[in-house]
Amino acid sequence: MRHTLALAVAAVTCLAAPVGAQEADLTVVPPVPADYRPKTTSWGEPDFRGGWPIDHLNGRTPLQRDPAHGNRAFLTEAEFAQRAETVEQLARRYETEDSQGTMGIGHWAEVAAANRRTSWIVSPANGRLPEFTAEGKRLSGEMRSTWRRGQPFDTWLDFDSWDRCITRGLPASMFPFMYNNGMRIFQSPGLVALQMEMVHETRLIPTDGSAPVPRQIRNWLGESRGRWENGNTLVVETTNFRPGPSATNIGTTGSPPANDTPVSSEAKLVETFTMTGPDSIVYDFTWSDPTIFTAPWSARLDWVRDDEFQIFEYACHEGNVQIRNYITASRAERAQERESSQ
């Protein structure tokens, strides 16, 4: 049932390729439509309130583009058909569990319909993350995570912020994941709140011209300041990031193979949320971190309204036992290795 809904949603979203995709220039990313004017709140600001889950984007579009696609932002018809078949095979797990009266990974990992995007990254033109600086490589090598193969665990410092159910960080939290893709926007005079289902975080974004906080005050999700432009766009600038979380997350298809993309104190995120229709938002962002990357990089995702989407509590690892279990198991494994080598 949910898969059927995803098929319908995907048909009208995901930065669709122009009509006649085979003849069109598949390297061109269309400009964001700018003529729609949403209704306003009672205090006169554009009204973005509602549910904006990104489940429909979880259809095998990777963060980074396959080098074989070059500078193409969209798939060819043949490539799209192949992706659609792959997604359909994944979705059948869901339907099989329904027919058998069981519930397992098929229900846990939500799969949407395929779309034509070759990557979420739109800049650089090759759709891939820029190279690390020398300092970025050094810091990446020092990061600790359960996603690093062969890494021992002796202390909580051997785990990343997502392992510890604290945060996926930014901009990683804004990309689709295999589950928990709920987003909801709340507004009050001078403030926008963006609730995220994953790790039940909420971003608070003042839009009242509040002065930035001192640079020495740093948070996992940084400090955001927003402003309204053109009657249909929320622009958000975020700085003051606390180093620690990875800027990319392995749970998003096509991300680096471990949560080891560092975030420095120089990182800056500039986002635009442009309402292009009563039920659509184009979400663009640019991430710049000159300490880590040799160049900024940008991504685009298309949001679709779903005010019926419900966000439930995400307990992550209830009882907070996961870290202890990892450490206990890691120490036991190493003890066995020492005994066997004697």
Model-identified regions with their sequence ranges:
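Bacterial N-terminal signal peptides
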Residues: 6-16
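Positively charged n-region of N-terminal signal peptides that target proteins for export
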Residues: 1-4
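PEST-like low-complexity, intrinsically disordered acidic/proline/serine-rich tracts
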Residues: 20-342
